[in-house]
Amino acid sequence: SAVRSNTVVSRSKLRTLYSLARRIESAGIEGIVAECGVFRGGSAALLAAATSPARQVYLFDSFQGLPEPGEKDGQQARSLYREGWCQGTAGDVRAVCRRLGVADSRVHLVEGWFQDTLPAFPPHPVALLHIDADWYESVRLCLSTFYQRVSPGGCIVFDDYGRWEGCTRAVDEFLSARGLRDRLVDGHYVVKPAERDVREDLPQCD
């Protein structure tokens, strides 16, 4: 499919992304969809197609591949890393979004390294945040930038939790500091607490 050929996100995680996208619509959660780490746009297109045509989608990527991992990312990441790894293009993203019938006007590409683009991003409320950023510093910056903007009942999804040491460490530290570590579902996503218990009827990863 157009989605699978333009992403390295697993099938089970794509199904969960779709379910969460539908959930923010049915629950009327306010805000944009934001994805940090876009590659060729497969998961971004899925999120855009699964949400309302009125909901704006912001996609953050350098389109130069992953940055070099740091000390907190562990030996495996540093030994496997190659320059240009996971590099897509803005054209790839536009093409797959169009194939899924998503209007260009909904999709906003924010090109550049996170440390350059995220601090300057306007404080839009966020309904769903998908972090596919692999390394400790990148994931930590995404969380510190966007967490306060996520609406109550909104979803934060971590693609690389449990796969890469740096991502796992960044997520554990961030959530634990806020008493949210036990709300991490299947090591994959967390729903920002609201007044009611937002853990009811949440989709499970296979």
Map each language-model feature to its residues.
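Short internal alpha-helix immediately C-terminal to a glycine-rich phosphate-binding loop
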Residues: 19
